[in-house]
Regions:
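Short strand-connecting beta-turns/loops that link adjacent beta-strands
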Residues: 125-127, 224, 233
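Single conserved hydrophobic/aromatic residue that forms the stacking wall/gate
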Residues: 226-238
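Metal-dependent nuclease catalytic cores that hydrolyze phosphodiester bonds in DNA/RNA
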Residues: 1-128
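Phosphate/oxyanion-binding loops and surfaces in catalytic or ligand/nucleic-acid-binding neighborhoods
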Residues: 48-52, 159, 202, 225
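Short cysteine clusters
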Residues: 18, 219-222
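Immediate flanking context of iron-sulfur cluster ligation sites
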Residues: 205-218
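Short, well-structured alpha-helical interface segments that form or flank functional binding sites
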Residues: 115, 147, 214-217, 231
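Mg2+/Mn2+-dependent nuclease catalytic core
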Residues: 37, 95-205
Length: 238
């Protein structure tokens, strides 16, 4: 299995709100769940469908997917078609936009040892597109002010900003089981201001296991809550 970052993009909503939770959760093993495996399977299928649509080499994964079904097939096809529409949009700005699928993105300039994997990154002259697939249907996810997406964007800027002179970042979340496509655009300078200010400050606290504990909605995703009583857990997240 691949190494997971202490301060990952996917857990950033939690550790930005509650910095010491990062080191606290380090003491507990993530046992996973059926929902997590469904998401993993869906991402594998999305990757395959998108590569096939773009004419890239790929291998049909369905026989190895534990939770593959007709709904997942429809979701993955819809995702691939949506990303293709963004590629066509990018071609209006750049003849040959770069499309990266399941790309490792390093944002350690701002977050110690920080990295993550972007579902799809599209780079065109002036504009960076970050696309994230969400298979869950419990909570509708917004791209606006979404720290996971913003961290992915920072990682992509590290790779391509000097080549493509990017000035705008467009972030899109595709969440078909909630019929949700959320898109948010921000200026690169605005993103960098956040990275050099709030993000860097909170990341330093989180990496050191310092800062104030802060209860809230983010507690739902805290591994340490597995080991406390149900009444206390409900009290924290209410």
């Amino acid at each position: 299995m691949g190494r997971h970052a202490l301060l990952s993009a996917s857990s950033s909503h939690r550790w930005l709100a509650c910095p010491p939770s990062a080191r606290l959760c380090e003491n507990y093993e993530d046992m996973g769940s059926e929902y997590a495996q469904q998401g993993t399977d869906a991402h594998s299928l999305c990757e395959h469908k998108l590569k096939a649509l773009l004419g890239m080499e790929t291998k049909e994964p369905t026989e190895e997917l534990e939770f593959y079904d007709e709904e997942m097939e429809e979701c993955a096809c819809g995702y691939a078609e949506y990303v293709l529409s963004l590629v066509e949009e990018a071609k209006k700005e750049c003849k040959d936009p770069v499309v990266l699928i399941e790309q490792r993105l390093d944002f350690s300039r701002y977050v110690e040892e920080g990295f993550g994997t972007g579902d799809c990154v599209i780079i065109a002259d002036g504009t960076l597109y970050i696309v994230d697939y969400k298979h869950g249907k419990g909570v509708e996810v917004s791209a606006e002010g979404n720290p996971q997406m913003m961290l992915y964007a920072l990682g992509a800027l590290e790779l391509f900003d000097g080549i493509y002179d990017i000035d705008t970042v467009r972030m899109a979340i595709y969440q078909p089981r909630r019929e949700n496509v959320s898109v948010y655009a921000m200026a690169k300078d605005e993103l960098l201001k956040w990275a050099e200010g709030e993000l860097s400050e909170k990341a330093k606290l989180a990496y050191a296991g310092e800062g104030e504990f802060c209860a809230g909605e983010h507690c739902k995703f805290c591994l340490s809550l597995i080991h406390i009583s149900e009444p206390t857990r409900l009290q924290l997240i209410s």
